[in-house]
Amino acid sequence: MEWRRPAGTLLRILGVAVAYYATGRLGLRLHVSVEGAVVTPLWLPTGIALACLLWFGPRIWPGLALGTYLSIERISAFDLVDLGIIAGNTLAPLCAYAMLRRVGFRPELDRLRDGLALVFLGGLLPMLISSTTGTWTLVLTGDLPVASFWPVWSAWWAGDTMGVLLLTPLLLVLRRARLPRDPYRVAEAAALAVTVGAVTLTATRSSLSLLFLVFPLLIWAAVRFRLPGAAPCALLVSVLAITAATDRAGPFAGHTLLEIMVNLQALNGAAALTALLLAALVTEQDDIRQKIEEVCEDLAEVVARLAPPKE
């Protein structure tokens, strides 16, 4: 029995490394070059890293380091100074995990406080570590001029944060999600998915300013299907928007790279926050209403027992 525990941990570490590397390759397909540095508007491995830490605990951290190493090898030849990037990409999700555990975060994301904790303690704050160490590593190695620090740093930080906000909730809820039994709900879910894809594709490829049309659909997904419906829709919106931005198509045409990145990350951030926080709020309100109904039923039973019998 003793050998099974280390073997199981080793398999999880290797699985995390493979997942990190695979999603890293997907993210690099949508990369942009900021001041000569390769960055991606949506770095999916950070979402993988935090979700795996919440599932398996901090023991799988070597998988994060190995996955980062493999991702760096994909871009360029590995150098010892790249250990700074590996350290930052490993420490950032570990710090996110520690802070979330500290505040009593629940992976079910069924409370508004859990959604807010994931946004600030899981994404915005800890990803400062990976972006700062990574950008300074490029500066110290001479691969990036000091004057270009802030543009690269901001793009790095935004990409890592979006990976947490868009992918981590999806992974956490899909692990326990179940298909609805009602055929009408299944049909509604299919209609929602098709509509989100069609509207987002149109909005991101049209020269007209139609990006606002995605938000009523995200509200629909959050209200009707909670996070299991809202999270995939937000990720789909983000991927289609990033594809259009890298192609400089639709509303992203004719703009500088800085303008494109600002507009893109504003859209991605707003979509992620709308889906995550609204779904968490609706779920919390449903749970409160259900508990109130249960208390009322229990109270009615007590009153019925204490009431004097009728003559």
Where are these regions (language model features)?
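Juxtamembrane helix-entry segments on the extracytoplasmic side of multipass membrane proteins
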Residues: 146-150
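Alpha-helical transmembrane segments that form the membrane-embedded catalytic/substrate-binding core
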Residues: 151, 155-167
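Heptad-repeat alpha-helical coiled-coil signal-transmission segments
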Residues: 278-281, 285-292, 296-299, 306
